[in-house]
A protein has these predicted regions:
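Short, C-terminally biased terminal segments at protein or domain edges
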Residues: 1-114
Length: 114
């Protein structure tokens, strides 16, 4: 599924980039951005597995969208703290926006994914 692949790719790129964050961020920004970006994929996987149950599917895609939005907030912090460059931020944010659009399509059209 395209949205899962895009989410997984972004989560891995965020992980690799976050390895460069200061050590004092390990239990705050670093762990939060890793957790939220990975959670996008885990919620997609859980929801897709139970896609025959429309309410469950929509709920999990909505959870995934919320985690995606949280990831964008952490990216804002990473940019403001100068842990990532504007170029990296723009790339990650653009990819996250695309994931959000795909998730919203799935939320609005769950019958297409049964």
């Amino acid at each position: 599924m395209a949205v899962y692949k895009k989410g997984f790719s972004l989560a891995m790129d965020i992980y690799r980039e976050s390895k460069k964050f200061p050590k004092d961020e390990l239990y705050s920004l670093t762990s939060q951005i890793r957790r939220s970006s990975r959670s996008v994929c885990s919620n997609i996987g859980e929801g897709y597995r139970k896609r025959q149950y429309e309410a469950h599917f929509v709920s999990k895609m909505s959870d995934s969208d919320m985690e995606n939005t949280e990831t964008q907030v952490w990216l804002d912090f990473a940019l403001s703290c100068e842990y990532i460059t504007k170029e990296i931020f723009d790339d990650f944010n653009e990819r996250s926006e695309e994931i959000g659009r795909l998730l919203n399509h799935m939320i609005q059209n769950p019958e297409k994914y049964k």
